[in-house]
Curated annotation (Swiss-Prot):
GO annotation (BP), single: aromatic amino acid family biosynthetic process
Catalysis performed (reactions): 3-phosphoshikimate + phosphoenolpyruvate = 5-O-(1-carboxyvinyl)-3-phosphoshikimate + phosphate
Gene assigned in the entry: aroA
Stated role: Catalyzes the transfer of the enolpyruvyl moiety of phosphoenolpyruvate (PEP) to the 5-hydroxyl of shikimate-3-phosphate (S3P) to produce enolpyruvyl shikimate-3-phosphate and inorganic phosphate.
Similarity remark: Belongs to the EPSP synthase family.
Organism: Bacillus cereus (strain G9842)
Molecular function terms from GO: 3-phosphoshikimate 1-carboxyvinyltransferase activity
Catalytic residues of the enzyme: D316
Full protein name: 3-phosphoshikimate 1-carboxyvinyltransferase
Length: 429
């Protein structure tokens, strides 16, 4: 378990950062390229541990995948060309891999067994396995399909019209991917619109997808045709530096190539509402996945209320939003964020516990947290508990604190941002 010491930053964070590739899009590009017909080239791929787990799983099913830096080539096998894996498919720490891949495996006539690390073993799978069973897939797991390892034997599926109890892009995507070979029209309706990378990318691969309000539909029997994918920078990774630029005195950061998919930009809306000073320069208007360069500088923030439809658009950014709120004048209330409890850690409990160690005034609620600003943070020993987003949030907190912060289990950040600490060090000079 590696630890990392973060010293206070005296002269602010300044400079340019090129944000690494979007994790969600990188996963999907490999998966969709694998089940497409033809050769797909992916540029800007994120070489984090999670996305490498996706590559490993599809290689295990006979897909030819080669990687050269951030460029990946996938020679697709088509929906019917995947081979039965000889070994257990290990997704590591990646919830995206196991949930989306389950939708693909539900289509396959062969047997597969899927597992991950200790964190994955605690995460709820029934939200995916239940609808896939309704479609006709044979899926089982611990506690009646609630937890990994999962065993899957797919086959002939029937389309369903599924009303999802949660706004989850992973649940929606698993069902849509299963629907590609299902008989009939598969439809998923959510309580709020979740991120739509799957819909956008399926369309890029030639699949017709219909969107009607909170419902997404596709007809079975459609094939994917290989295409080239340009992956923009991950706005969830950018979020840590957006907040850092806003709350660390004497800072000015230029973040290049930040993905601006409107289902993911809740962090931008929240920072704007809190009073952050930034400019956005679009760089690829008209692309399937829009991107921009963002300049942000030290700002005076105020507390706000966050809840409702915006939550699915910023669910992964809530840990660092909570940090921003500790440096805002007034009270910030975050609600409707039950999904935080089933992430890599229970992020409500983890955020509250670790920021409290640093002197923040913050309370957990059943569906979020209440943060009382403005707090002077102090040095202490904290822990990521294997959660990459907690680790990065604590590192930004360390730049502000009076005294050094020691982060235990700091290597967890490699899941989504392998060069994070190098970037932070460079900007602090």
């Amino acid at each position: 378990m590696k630890e990392r010491t973060i010293q206070p930053v005296n002269n602010g964070l300044n400079g340019n950062i090129t944000i690494p590739g979007d994790k969600s899009i990188s996963h999907r590009a490999v998966m969709f390229g694998s089940i497409a017909e033809g050769k797909t080239t992916i540029k800007g791929f994120l070489s984090g541990a999670d996305c490498l787990s996706t590559i490993s799983c599809f290689k295990e099913m006979g897909v030819e995948i080669t990687q050269n830096g951030d460029e990946v080539t996938v020679v697709g096998k088509g929906l019917e060309g995947l081979q039965e894996p000889k070994a257990v498919l290990d997704v590591g720490n990646s919830g995206t891999t196991i949930r989306l891949m389950s939708g693909i495996l539900a289509n396959t006539p062969f047997f597969s067994c899927v597992q991950g690390d200790e964190s994955i073993a605690k995460r709820p799978m029934k939200r995916v396995t239940n609808p896939l069973k309704q479609m006709g897939a044979n899926i089982d797991g611990r506690e009646e399909g609630t937890f990994t390892p999962l065993t899957i034997r797919g086959g002939d599926l029937k389309a369903i019209e599924y009303i999802s109890p949660v706004a989850s892009a992973q649940v929606k995507s698993a069902i849509l991917l299963a629907g590609l070979r299902a008989e009939g029209v598969t439809a998923v309706t959510e309580p709020h619109i979740s991120r739509d990378h799957t819909e956008r990318m399926l369309e890029a691969f030639g699949v017709k997808v219909t969107r009607e309000g909170k419902t997404v539909k596709l007809s079975g029997g459609q094939k994917l045709t290989a295409t080239d994918i340009q992956v923009p920078g991950d706005v969830s990774s950018a979020a840590f530096f957006l907040v850092a630029g806003a709350i660390i005195p004497n800072s000015k950061l230029i973040l290049q190539n930040v993905g601006m998919n409107p289902t993911r930009t809740g962090i931008i809306d929240v920072l704007e509402k809190m009073g952050a000073t930034f400019t956005i320069e679009p760089i690829n208007e008209g692309a399937s996945e829009p991107a921009a360069n963002i300049t942000i500088e030290t700002s005076s923030l105020k507390g706000i209320e966050i809840g409702g439809d915006i939550i699915p658009r910023l669910i992964d950014e809530i840990p660092v939003i909570a940090l921003a709120a500790t440096q805002a004048e007034g009270i910030t209330v975050i609600r409707d964020a039950h999904e935080l409890k089933v992430k890599e850690t229970n992020r409500i409990d983890t955020v509250v516990a670790e920021l409290t160690k640093l002197g923040a005034r913050i309370e957990a609620t059943d569906d979020g947290m209440i943060i009382y600003g403005k707090s002077a943070l102090k040095g202490n020993t904290v822990n990521s508990y294997g959660d990459h987003r907690i680790g990065m949030m604590l590192a930004i907190a360390g730049c502000l604190a009076e005294g050094k912060i020691i982060i235990e289990d700091a290597e967890a950040v490699g899941v989504s941002y392998p060069t994070f600490f190098d970037e932070l060090q460079k900007l602090a000079k």
